[in-house]
Amino acid sequence: MPLILPEFIESDEKMKYNIPGDCMIGLKNPYISVEYSGQPSFGGDQRRCGGKVLQRCGCGVVAALDMLLYLNCWHSDVHIPEFANFCAASPLPQPAYEQALEMLRRAYFPLFYPFGMNGLALSLGMNLFFKRHTLPYKARWSVPRTELWQRIGAMLERDLPVIMAVGPNFPRFWQKKGANFFRLSPEGRYEPSVSARAHFVTATGLDDEWIELSSWGSRYYMRRDEFARYAKECSNSLLCSILYIEHK
């Protein structure tokens, strides 16, 4: 079940939805930011990497690194020597961030160009990292479809970012149907922005209607029913799922 290339399409259509409510569950601390040219990012962006492999299919490695950096910065039971000099209070320098990406790609999350990696490979790499660094966590790929939102909420309540996959089209893998992402405008409108498929993202917030996401170094939102629709009509619930992480 390879995750292949993201498909993102700018949309001119404008729609209005309610802004996120006070009931949104979110991470308790600032999310990882990288100092690219321009404004600081919301998570890493594989498209800005220097290497062709990471640029084209590195979304899973970016999601894994952002999660590990977040744990190292904000969880007292996590100490990762390789990330000791990274500071969560300010944007991370792009060269240091890309060096960490390359380390993870070579040692834990191999990418098969141009297909990337799938959820099972992501879970195996994460568990290997946890074991080598004696971290008190374990990871597994996919949860039952009926428990998806409950598990995402539970992880966010424990201040754990949630790596999600918008899976590839399946079984018609050659199709280019995507799930719609939105941005929140200064006026409080959710406006359609991009469409994605075969792409790892990170959930940083959740309410009854919306998921807050980090993808391509930016903050996006996706409707919960849109994710469910895409999984049912264009992919399946194994490919469209999460990396569930528990404390041992």
Language model: regions and residue ranges:
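Noncatalytic regulatory segments and standalone regulatory/sensor domains
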Residues: I25, R48, F181-K248
